[in-house]
Design a protein with these regions (language model features):
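Bacterial Sec-dependent N-terminal signal peptides
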Residues: 1-22
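Conserved beta-alpha junction segments in alpha/beta enzyme cores
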Residues: 21-238, 244-245, 249-263, 267-274, ...
Length: 441
């Protein structure tokens, strides 16, 4: 068996494994709900998936937190478990634990170390229970659960859906399906050698803020969806939710917002439950249709890269944005990106990836190294404006999203071997001759 190939060039780290290596997978689920003063409606979890082929070993960790990054997790998992990369995939639930109003991404959050320890524990448990694995993936379109919350108004600019005017009601209670959205859900199914499903990973683009301002801990609709999928498959199946490019996508069903923790008005969790159920139904149906994975030797490839950007308004800002490009079995392409990408970027990338004949999955809100870039609007959305598009002085420069997607596309073709690193062969050869004969009707 050939050794792992590791190439370093221009800030790019490429890792790929020979097809003769056995593909191994491990998974674990750990409750990360801290002991705090807040009431708990439903627990939040860290669900990990480790993939290994030869010397290449990396982990996805889906966390029920708004935004979570940690260099400590990366360091310890590399030293303790030989993990080359840990990708933290935040579901972006707005009802995460918030001690004294602090979010998971804010400095001084007293639960940060606890979260880190629990996530490291999940990765360790995954490593302790590796099994020979087979992987399949698919995607399907179904009636949209979300809408584009940046609604174009009379002056030609867009405003966020919670901004009302003479024509639109705050929070879109009429459930008008504004677009663009991505109505597809993507699914990765991982089986053991007996054909028993062990892991279901769902990839969907929609904000997890149905019960925002509920002043209680909840994993929101992703938590409901994961629970329903796990119940449907049973046998200890673990279900990971990975957010897509849902930066400007809001759920069509939301709960009315409370004004504060002492507000006598109570949060209605029915919209959250129903949205999670609808998503889970599609995921279960798709996962079951995938059936057993092909028996050919699996392949696993990973390429890490980074790009630097400045701010749109504040040119003193420096965003070091790390990207991961993954190809599994030459048929599954994953573009992992940090930040809150707008959905048009996902639609554009997937359209280009269709030409490659692969199942494309964009993992948004997925951090491995570097800075968290916040909202990342496509160029048109940046021009139209609205929340996350032109509000705030810490926004990333215009065009950063397109640059990230273009780099992901180029890195995919580097990984699959089509992108040459030297000039290609010249096709023309001198001396070729032909004779043109007139055609007589």
């Amino acid at each position: 068996m050939k050794k792992l190939i590791a190439l370093l060039f221009a800030g790019v780290s490429l890792m790929t494994q020979n097809t003769k290596a056995q593909l191994m997978a491990g998974t674990a689920r750990v409750n990360i709900t801290p002991q705090g003063k807040e009431s708990v409606h439903d627990s939040v979890y860290a669900r990990s998936l480790v993939l290994q082929s030869g010397q290449l070993r990396f982990a996805f960790v889906s966390v029920d937190l708004a935004v979570f990054t940690s260099e400590r997790i990366e360091k310890i998992c590399k030293e303790k478990y030989g993990i080359s990369q840990v990708m933290l995939c935040s579901s972006h639930n707005h009802s995460e634990p918030q001690p004294d109003g602090k979010r998971s991404f804010q400095q001084g959050n007293p639960f940060t170390v606890y979260y880190e320890d629990q996530i490291i524990k999940a990765v360790g448990e995954s490593m302790a229970h590796l099994f020979p694995a087979r992987i399949t993936a698919g995607r399907q379109t179904f009636p949209q659960l979300g809408f584009n919350r940046l609604i174009i108004r009379e002056d030609g600019h867009a405003r966020e859906s919670w901004f009302s005017d003479d024509q639109y009601t705050s929070e879109n209670p009429e459930r008008i399906p504004f677009g663009p959205v991505d109505p597809e859900v993507g699914v990765i199914r991982i089986d053991d050698e007996q054909g028993q499903p062990r892991v279901i990973l769902m990839n969907y683009a929609c904000h997890a803020d149905i019960v925002c301002f509920n002043y209680a801990v909840s994993a929101d609709y992703p938590g409901v969806a994961c629970r329903k999928v796990e119940e449907a498959f049973g046998h200890g199946v673990n279900c990971l939710f990975v957010q897509g490019a849902g930066g400007n996508i809001e759920s069509l069903q939301i709960s009315s917002r409370r004004k504060g923790p002492d507000d006598p008005f109570q949060t209605d969790y029915a919209p959250m439950e129903r949205t999670g159920e609808l998503l889970a139904f599609q995921v279960i149906k798709l996962a079951k249709s995938l059936g057993a994975a092909a028996t050919q030797p699996p392949t696993l490839q990973l390429l890490e890269d980074s790009l630097h950007f400045t701010g749109r308004f504040n040119k003193k800002l420096d965003y070091n944005v790390h990207l991961s490009t993954i190809i599994i079995n030459n048929t599954i392409a994953i573009a992992a990106c940090p930040g809150e990408l707008f959905v048009q970027l996902q639609l554009d990338w997937k359209k280009k990836m269709e030409l490659a004949g692969v199942t494309p999955l964009l993992f948004g809100y997925t951090w491995s190294k570097g800075n968290w870039p916040g909202y990342i609007a496509d160029v048109r959305s940046a021009a139209l404006g609205g929340y996350g598009a032109d509000q705030g002085d810490n926004l990333i420069e215009v065009g950063a999203g397109e640059a990230m997607i273009t780099r992901q596309l180029a890195n995919f073709y580097r990984l699959n071997g089509l992108m040459r690193d030297k000039p290609g062969p010249v096709g023309f050869k001198g001396g070729a001759q032909w004779i043109i004969k007139p055609f007589k009707p």
